[in-house]
From Swiss-Prot:
Gene coding for it: Hpse
InterPro entries assigned: Glyco_hydro_79, Glycoside_hydrolase_SF
Predominant cellular place of this UniProt entry's protein: membrane
Protein's recorded name: Heparanase
Subunit structure of this chain's protein: Heterodimer; heterodimer formation between the 8 kDa and the 50 kDa subunits is required for enzyme activity. Interacts with TF; the interaction, inhibited by heparin, enhances the generation of activated factor X and activates coagulation. Interacts with HRG; the interaction is enhanced at acidic pH, partially inhibits binding of HPSE to cell surface receptors and modulates its enzymatic activity. Interacts with SDC1; the interaction enhances the shedding of SDC1. Interacts with HPSE2.
Binding site for heparan sulfate group: 55-57, 90, 151-155, 263-273, 289, 296, 341-343, 382-384
Record localization: Lysosome membrane; Secreted; Nucleus
Described function: Endoglycosidase that cleaves heparan sulfate proteoglycans (HSPGs) into heparan sulfate side chains and core proteoglycans. Participates in extracellular matrix (ECM) degradation and remodeling. Selectively cleaves the linkage between a glucuronic acid unit and an N-sulfo glucosamine unit carrying either a 3-O-sulfo or a 6-O-sulfo group. Can also cleave the linkage between a glucuronic acid unit and an N-sulfo glucosamine unit carrying a 2-O-sulfo group, but not linkages between a glucuronic acid unit and a 2-O-sulfated iduronic acid moiety.
Glycosylated residue positions: 155, 193, 210, 452
GO BP field: angiogenesis involved in wound healing; cell-matrix adhesion; establishment of endothelial barrier; heparan sulfate proteoglycan catabolic process; heparin proteoglycan metabolic process; positive regulation of blood coagulation; positive regulation of hair follicle development; positive regulation of osteoblast proliferation
Amino acid sequence: MLRPLLLLWLWGRLGALTQGTPAGTAPTKDVVDLEFYTKRLFQSVSPSFLSITIDASLATDPRFLTFLGSPRLRALARGLSPAYLRFGGTKTDFLIFDPNKEPTSEERSYWQSQDNNDICGSERVSADVLRKLQMEWPFQELLLLREQYQREFKNSTYSRSSVDMLYSFAKCSRLDLIFGLNALLRTPDLRWNSSNAQLLLNYCSSKGYNISWELGNEPNSFWKKAHISIDGLQLGEDFVELHKLLQKSAFQNAKLYGPDIGQPRGKTVKLLRSFLKAGGEVIDSLTWHHYYLNGRVATKEDFLSSDVLDTFILSVQKILKVTKEMTPGKKVWLGETSSAYGGGAPLLSDTFAAGFMWLDKLGLSAQLGIEVVMRQVFFGAGNYHLVDENFEPLPDYWLSLLFKKLVGPKVLMSRVKGPDRSKLRVYLHCTNVYHPRYREGDLTLYVLNLHNVTKHLKLPPPMFSRPVDKYLLKPFGSDGLLSKSVQLNGQTLKMVDEQTLPALTEKPLPAGSSLSVPAFSYGFFVIRNAKIAACI
């Protein structure tokens, strides 16, 4: 039953189906009918489906890890819980743990201010320290981006204090930490040298830390980054070696994820196949990365293109096909993803316009069976962050927060009737049962309108007779789609104070209303009292 539904949905998404509006409905192109498939669940994703990353580049100069002690930053991260926090990225393979390295003065200042009995309740970073780091951050960010563009990466070391800072951030933000280990530490015969990982495991074990692990980042690009070529067979054997280390340590029950490959193109797919053959059994979920565009050349039109959005489908299908063939039943995660690679697209990836890519990727991932999607990056260098250098939440943060509050892990299916559905994209889940306003059986519909006119959506019977809560997001200010401020139902979203998120207030619609979605906007509609058995 599910396979025919999936084919129907995919054909509709790619524009192959051209059903007309049913007889008796108004022949206007701006009023559209929806179809819901709610008899059974289509997919089920993790409660931590929407997760986040901290790029390993933040530890290049460990002083800047002190940012993670900010109560404001932690409050923003806590809003996205439950979630995984992945510490990884290109610099993963250029970071070396030095247990004898002394903490930086900034780190030392932070730890001296802590109450060891209540580390999450007492954390305060000196305002002077934060101000100094924020003044220096633009220069550090330029160094990191230049290193990335020039592909000239240098090894850096991090201390026990750096690990403590990262773990403290995850724990106090109620996130589950996934730590990426350096895979480019090699013996002369190119096997993985696990000695540095062993030092880190020993330290984390002594502290009682609960951590999951990865090994390496985008191994398909090792030659470009370090002039070292590792094939999938060797990489699989390296993961088996890491798994053995974990089994001999306090981390015998820890999860292991990988191989964090890049886009699924020819040689990368070949690497994945041989990796899964050699090491597929020891990973708990398969991880891969996706970006739509090159951040240096991406345009506003690209960010609003349904054709660009649809390219993601084919990438997912390639990954799922290989996974099913080599390791049937293995869960697949998007271990790192955003709009554009290379740190994002300036003046685009941190604006309202980026939300179309982000929300659509979440919808497609859930529909296609990706269990977890890790957003690059929560905070850090580049333009694709959720929170900026002043700890101000950006449009994609607010979009992520709404998704967390309203969207549950049980996935259903919705479809727009009629032709040209690619610019009006709809997704349907059971509502998050932990939202105090809603109950089991309610539905959450989320919608993206890429048309330049308002679209009026008509719910199918019997849903059209149910009350609906609207959560519509629109840009605020004269910058329009390039704005870094967002309004929810006409109210600008901003933090109440340093540690308090605003209320996300619904706009109730009377039963029988059409759902109006203005041009170039997106939002959520919670259908109350839907009483869908599959959601209960």
